[in-house]
């Protein structure tokens, strides 16, 4: 599933081709995504794009009359293509833009979403979200205070969007490894010092992944069709049984909340 770095990579990739341009109309080949494509998108015409933003794992296209909210789901990606580029099997939505380009949404598993909101404050999918991990709101003190008396395992707790947004399965495993913290500890066991280190590593891992264009494990592509290169730098995720790059001990795998967690028991405590 695309996580924060992949969504931010998509945002940065599509922004130069959309802002200041006009969406002439939308082509929806299959409206049956996780939720049906909103009617307002089906009938969209001649709408200038004011900004391209991101909140958590949602892309937000600001138009004069409201917002298009895009979620990439499990396997979605956005590409900027020439208008004459023929659609393929899993190309479900196009936005046709005044500069001769199209923004094409591809999603083999159709678990993404294209929604409409009159304003972001009334959007159900954006309600109750925690702070952005790269913002000044996400501090060691915030994380420490939030973790008090929490018996939930720290790794699934970090993936809770009410705690902090956008830290999905890949980056929770990678950040905990970088901080030297075992993922099966209770969140409430975090110390002050560990909170400082964990917040710093989450920010560093996410920023480095964004610089590398995100992580491509299966379906994700950048807006120019290239894969994300952070997959080549993964320390633990997807490496069960392989030697740890720091100590040589085998990377272990466990199931936490039906998600695979990767860690090194020798380097993490």
UniProtKB/Swiss-Prot annotation:
Coiled coil: none annotated. Monomer. Pfam families: Fapy_DNA_glyco, H2TH, zf-FPG_IleRS. InterPro entries: DNA_glyclase/AP_lyase_DNA-bd, DNA_glyclase_Znf_dom_DNA_BS, Formamido-pyr_DNA_Glyclase, FPG_cat, MutM-like_N-ter, Ribosomal_uS13-like_H2TH, Znf_DNA_glyclase/AP_lyase, Znf_FPG/IleRS. This is Formamidopyrimidine-DNA glycosylase. A zinc finger (FPG-type) spans 235-269. Its EC number is 3.2.2.23, 4.2.99.18. The lineage of its organism: Bacteria, Pseudomonadati, Pseudomonadota, Gammaproteobacteria, Enterobacterales. The keyword Zinc applies. The keyword Metal-binding applies. GO terms for molecular function: 8-oxo-7,8-dihydroguanine DNA N-glycosylase activity; class I DNA-(apurinic or apyrimidinic site) endonuclease activity; damaged DNA binding; DNA-(apurinic or apyrimidinic site) endonuclease activity; zinc ion binding. Belongs to the FPG family. Binds 1 zinc ion per subunit. The active site is at residues 2-3, 57, 259. SUPFAM superfamilies: Glucocorticoid receptor-like (DNA-binding domain) (SSF57716), N-terminal domain of MutM-like DNA repair proteins (SSF81624), S13-like H2TH domain (SSF46946). DNA binds at residues 90, 109, 150. It catalyses: Hydrolysis of DNA containing ring-opened 7-methylguanine residues, releasing 2,6-diamino-4-hydroxy-5-(N-methyl)formamidopyrimidine; 2'-deoxyribonucleotide-(2'-deoxyribose 5'-phosphate)-2'-deoxyribonucleotide-DNA = a 3'-end 2'-deoxyribonucleotide-(2,3-dehydro-2,3-deoxyribose 5'-phosphate)-DNA + a 5'-end 5'-phospho-2'-deoxyribonucleoside-DNA + H(+). GO terms for biological process: base-excision repair. Its cofactor is Zn(2+). Involved in base excision repair of DNA damaged by oxidation or by mutagenic agents. Acts as a DNA glycosylase that recognizes and removes damaged bases. Has a preference for oxidized purines, such as 7,8-dihydro-8-oxoguanine (8-oxoG). Has AP (apurinic/apyrimidinic) lyase activity and introduces nicks in the DNA strand. Cleaves the DNA backbone by beta-delta elimination to generate a single-strand break at the site of the removed base with both 3'- and 5'-phosphates. Keywords: DNA damage, DNA repair, DNA-binding, Glycosidase, Hydrolase, Lyase, Metal-binding, Multifunctional enzyme, Zinc, Zinc-finger. CDD domains: EcFpg-like_N. SMART domains: Fapy_DNA_glyco (SM00898), H2TH (SM01232). It comes from the Bacteria.
């Amino acid at each position: 599933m695309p996580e924060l770095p992949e969504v931010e990579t998509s945002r940065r990739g599509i922004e130069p081709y959309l802002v200041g341009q006009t969406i002439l109309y939308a082509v929806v080949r299959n409206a049956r995504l996780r939720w049906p494509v909103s009617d307002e998108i089906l009938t969209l015409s001649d709408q200038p794009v004011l900004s391209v933003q991101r909140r958590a794992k949602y892309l937000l296209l600001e138009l004069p009359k409201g917002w298009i909210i895009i979620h990439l789901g499990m396997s979605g990606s956005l590409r900027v293509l020439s208008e004459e580029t023929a659609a393929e099997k899993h190309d479900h939505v196009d936005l046709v833009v005044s500069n001769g380009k199209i923004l094409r949404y591809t999603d083999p598993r159709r678990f993404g979403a294209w929604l409409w909101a009159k304003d972001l404050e009334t959007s159900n999918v954006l309600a109750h979200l925690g702070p952005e991990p790269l913002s000044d709101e996400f501090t060691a003190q915030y994380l420490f205070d939030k973790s008090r008396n929490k018996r939930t395992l720290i790794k699934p707790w970090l993936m809770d969007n009410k705690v902090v947004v956008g830290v999905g399965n890949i980056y929770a495993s990678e950040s905990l490894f970088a901080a030297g913290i075992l993922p099966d500890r209770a969140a409430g066991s975090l110390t002050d010092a560990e909170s400082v280190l964990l917040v710093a590593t989450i920010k560093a891992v996410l920023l480095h992944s964004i610089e590398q264009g995100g992580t491509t494990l299966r379906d994700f592509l950048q807006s120019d069709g290239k894969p994300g290169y952070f997959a080549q730098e993964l320390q633990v995720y997807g490496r069960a049984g392989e030697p740890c790059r720091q100590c040589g001990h085998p990377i272990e795998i466990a199931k936490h909340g039906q998600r695979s967690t990767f860690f090194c028991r020798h380097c993490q405590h």
